[in-house]
Every structure is written in structure tokens, then in C-alpha cells.
UniProtKB/Swiss-Prot annotation:
Name assigned to this protein: WD repeat-containing protein 48
Region Disordered, residue ranges: 607-628
Native organism: Pongo abelii
Gene transcribed to yield this protein: WDR48
Keywords: Acetylation, Cytoplasm, DNA damage, DNA repair, DNA-binding, Endosome, Lysosome, Nucleus, Phosphoprotein, Repeat, Ubl conjugation pathway, WD repeat
Origin organism lineage: Eukaryota, Metazoa, Chordata, Craniata, Vertebrata
Record-listed Phosphotyrosine modification sites: Y28
PTM-bearing positions, type N6-acetyllysine: K214, K578
Amino acid sequence: MAAHHRQNTAGRRKVQVSYVIRDEVEKYNRNGVNALQLDPALNRLFTAGRDSIIRIWSVNQHKQDPYIASMEHHTDWVNDIVLCCNGKTLISASSDTTVKVWNAHKGFCMSTLRTHKDYVKALAYAKDKELVASAGLDRQIFLWDVNTLTALTASNNTVTTSSLSGNKDSIYSLAMNQLGTIIVSGSTEKVLRVWDPRTCAKLMKLKGHTDNVKALLLNRDGTQCLSGSSDGTIRLWSLGQQRCIATYRVHDEGVWALQVNDAFTHVYSGGRDRKIYCTDLRNPDIRVLICEEKAPVLKMELDRSADPPPAIWVATTKSTVNKWILKGIHNFRASGDYDNDCTNPITPLCTQPDQVIKGGASIIQCHILNDKRHILTKDTNNNVAYWDVLKACKVEDLGKVDFEDEIKKRFKMVYVPNWFSVDLKTGMLTITLDESDCFAAWVSAKDAGFSSPDGSDPKLNLGGLLLQALLEYWPRTHVNPMDEEENEVNHVNGEQENRVQKGNGYFQVPPHTPVIFGEAGGRTLFRLLCRDSGGETESMLLNETVPQWVIDITVDKNMPKFNKIPFYLQPHASSGAKTLKKDRLSASDMLQVRKVMEHVYEKIINLDNESQTTSSSNNEKPGEQEKEEDIAVLAEEKIELLCQDQVLDPNMDLRTVKHFIWKSGGDLTLHYRQKST
């Protein structure tokens, strides 16, 4: 009954289908890295990617390949991560509106929390209490007991959460002290709001920043807070005095990331200006430029294996993550070669990172070709690639070639309606199918490069074929299953089921392709790999999630209707023929011009009445076929079809004529005339 109710709910909301074209193993961060967590016990670094993937890396420098594993379940940017339970559990927050709980050692997702209604931007962790807070653009803060979260199972899946309300704007930063007695949020409201998480009581509001508050830190006992803002300043606040006690103007632009040593005496800051400084909180004039990154700094993570910290890991809007050594920082400071005037250029402590976790390229530009099947892309390394949307794969790497030239080179005078949309947000190609236009594009099998067993050239619906391929492994889509009795006999005899038809009969997509069912507007309902839809749990969730418009084509095999195009057919002015009564004709938008020419020849010009009479009295099929072939040949020899006074190619279809030649509102008008001999 519950499943039935949920199916109804899915029916009421508008559900889209998306899939990602990618390699099975995406080893490298394909986009900027939003968050970092270091596990010193296992020498592992966790990176949270804008490509939706959390990756685990070894920070042992003797390892040639630092990649360990990927943690994949999110469908949009992962904005923040925290390691809990001495590194056993990882909590992640994403723009897909979910918070996920992971087994950090084994790398699998244990549960998903769906309380947020918009992007989840920040997490905070109280180590002594195993308490995590999440916050985001929905202005809500939720508190989670980590021990409760890790105990969740398929049957015990109810979790209670406390919430902190009162934020008036989107939250971008969050901090909680280790004892779990104070929580602070920063937002586009430009103020810091402070609560007691034990009672959910609002304690205070701190004013001073003039722009979004992007980074927050609290000391252990929750008496002092550091904030970094897009206004370019770092502020130190006394929560006891409820005021700002120091302002540090270290950066030329917005401050987006902060770290502080355990003693809360030195702050490490980075942001839009790409520079990373260490500032002595007790003597603000003393600040050391540690390094300069190649892109704006998004997050930093101190290596706390010793005191003072020996190194700092830095993530930026680029996909590479760097480790910078802090070894000489005290000598550097003692020498007096520090920055006491941030307008003067100074030499950074480090010019080269000590360790580099190499990133991959991100797709930044794409062009959908006229056939509405292939896409050209350009990435951050200026490499151009050619992709097949229908088969969900890369066809060819073209290298560093001119993008516009490649587009021109592949232009074809053919029009196919739009039937999908493309998103590059994760740095990979995400294709989305929507009920409103998914079935708009029909092509002939021959034009699509597919052959039929019977040699015919059927019309194929691109969106329909793709949906059938994406759900090929879902048993509910399989055709002609044996009845249970036969199935049992077969099972006993060990025979394979050969009668079941899967997929679309023309092509398959790579089995590792991620398929995402989500609400229009972003909330993900279900993500799975194409090959996993045969699993019992996945199959059950698909029953609850797949919308009716997808069921119609994949399960019920109801093909959508052909698109019709209305048009008028008139003699050309140069023919001297009398204008016909203006009858509005209608045909499939894929009808070729040659078929209209045949219609003109046979029904209007009617050049050879005798031949027609003879043929019509002959009912034998060979005669009919000859007649058809004769008319086709004669029509092309004797008839010309024009649109806007341009002679049409017989191979062109009506939708292409309308799009490229008619180019105006109202119904398409075609003119015919006899060729001059």
C-alpha cells in the first residue's frame, strides 16, 4: 500500500531522467574541489568534488599513484565533508539537496538524509559529542547524532533531527565547537547567528561584515569565533562580549577559506586572490605569504600530525589539490621578511607544492550538432572531443583543434527537433530527458546507421530508443517472459531463457552509465548504474520512481505518435498553371521531398493516363512495384519542387525544408513545376 501511495506521489510530480556520459572509473577530480578532510591515522585525504564524486587518496609520498577509491552517490556538487568517529564515518553535503552518511574505510554510502529542500552548502562537527550540523540555501540548520546515523538500516530507517530556525538568508558557512555547546552560521545576510545546539536557543546575532560570510571557525570552548567574508576581511569575535574584537585586512579580494592552529593563535586564510597567508592573531602586523595558487582557493586542510602544523592541503576551483610545506614559517617570521603592508609584493614562503594530487580536465563548452545526436565539447586543456548522446559514449578525441572549425566541418543541412538538454555543471556531460520534448525526434533507421533484420528502413524515435537502452536491465521492461510453469521447468533443466527481449534491439549504452531520476528543478529521487536495475532493491525503487511517461515506452512499448507537419502545395508562378484550391495537406515531418514530387507527378500532373490505366488493371505485385519505381524515377526526371524560390533536394525532409528554407511563421508552402526539357 505504501509503495502504491509513493507511486502516486511520483506521478504527481514532474520527473525527469538524466544520465552521465563518462568512463567507468573516473580517477581524477574533473572539476574544482570544494572540501577536504585528512585522516592522519590511515594517511588518507578525502576530496569532495564539483564533479559530484568524493575521492580517497593516499598521502604517502612514496606511492606513485595516490588514488585509492571513489565514493559515488551524489548527483551534483559535493559542497562539504566531515570525518567523524575517528575516521570511520564520513558525512557529505551536496547541491543535490541531500546529506549522505558513508563508511569511510570501505567507501560505500550507508544512508541518505533528505530533510533539506535546497542546496546543502556547509557542515559542522563537534568531535567530543559526535554531533554534526548541516545547513544550506533553504536557510535551515539540522542537527544529527552521528551514532544514530551510523545505526540506520533498511528496516530501521527513521531518524529524528533538531532544527535551528531564524536565518533570514541562504547559509554558506557553519561552525560548531568540539564540545558541541555553540553553533555559528554565516550567510548572505552578512551577520553571524549563534545558537546553543543543546537547547536550540538563539543566543545572539553579530554584525560587522559587509558581504557574504563564507568561512567560520570556533575555538574549543566556544568563546571565540573567526570569520572570513567576501568583503575581503577576517574578523575575530568574542562571543562573551558579543562583538568583533579584531579585523584583519590580509587579502585583496574575498576570503573563502580559513584554518586555525589548535591553540587558536595563527589563522591560515585563502580566497579569491589565490594567495594563502598565515596571520598571527595576537600581532596582526605579522603575516606570512605561504604560497600563491593558480586559481581561487575554495578549502584548506591543516596537517595536524605535529605542532606547529607541518603542512597545509589546498583545494581550488581547478581540479588539482596541492600540499604546501609550512616548515620554515617560524624562521621566516623571525627574519622580519613578512608582509606588514599587504599592498607591497612579497616573496612567498613556498614557490612549489611539496605534493600534488593531479586533477583531470573539465568540459567547459559544448555544441549540439544538427543531427541532435552528436555533441562536440572543449575542455579546460583545450582538447576537443566528439560524443554520441544516443549510445552514451565518447566517439573520438580530436585533440587541440579549433572548436568552431570542427563545428563548421560537421554541419549537415538536416533538421532534427531538440529532444534533450545538456548540463556541464559537474565538468562531465549530463544529458536530461523531459516528457515535454523527449519524443520529438524521429529518424529513419538508415540515417541513424542501424540496419533492420528484414532490410526495411523503419522510423525510430531517438528518445524512446534511449530510454529503452537506459532501462534495459530492469526486468519489468523485458518482453515475452515465459509463464511461471515454463520458467520453473527451464530452471530445473538449467536452460537459458532465450525468448526474453531486452532493450531496443539496435544498441546498448555502457552498463556503468549512471541514470538519475529527479524532479524538474533539481531534487534527486533515485540514482543507479544502468547495469544495477536488475537488482531486487533497485527494481523495487524503480517501480516507485519511474514516471508514467517512461513506463509507457519502456514497459508498455507504446511508441509515441509521429510528428505531423501541415503544408500547402501550389503550382509555381513560372509554370503558367492555374492556382489550385488551397487545400491544407498534412504529412509526417520526416517525409522526403521526393515523395511529395511523386504525389505531384501522379495525382496532379498525371502525365501518362494510359500507363496509369494499364497499371491499375494489373493487380500483380511485381507490376505494382514497377509502377512505384517508374513513378519515382519519372517524378525526379520531370518535376521540381521549390520553397521560397529555391529548388529542393529530393532527399531533404519536410522539417529540414521548414527550418532551413521556409524560415518563417505560418504553414509551409511548396511550389511545383515541370522541368524544362
